[in-house]
């Protein structure tokens, strides 16, 4: 698949995330998808590698249980000759348990196989997240 087609797949994943439609996200992933936030320290419920479609819903459940997402804005999409997609995003949420607001930048990297996401890594400010999660 071309980078342009893969970018459209990522956009569809983001739209599904905005609707809370995890099944639509899973449809766009390989059965053995390797999905994780690259976290220096695993403090958030979505941290840790999720292996396969059976584990992936826990990533999104972790985000949901933390608190409402108040901004999820992809700012740029880039694809390479291998069809990989990189995205720069603006992200904000409120931690329900602490009432703290988080505003940060995210970087997402997607690798594809046969038109589906086979590998995902997202980078985030883990120190900022850890601070927001602590009382």
Where in this protein do the model-derived segments appear?
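Short amphipathic alpha-helical segments, especially helix-boundary/capping motifs
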Residues: 18-19, 32-38, 83-86, 103-106
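A beta-strand edge to alpha-helix "cap/lid" segment located at domain peripheries
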Residues: 1-5, 61-135
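Short, mixed-charge, low-aromatic patches
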Residues: 11-20, 43-47, 63-67, 88-90
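Short, low-complexity N-terminal intrinsically disordered segments enriched in polar/charged residues
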Residues: 1-31, 134-135
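Short, flexible micro-motifs
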Residues: 19, 23, 51, 55, ...
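Hydrophobic pocket/interface hotspot
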Residues: 10-13, 25-26, 33, 52, ...
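Charged, low-complexity, helix/coiled-coil-prone segments
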Residues: 1-10, 46-55, 102-104
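A solvent-exposed, acidic/Ser-Thr-rich amphipathic alpha-helical stretch
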Residues: 24, 30-83
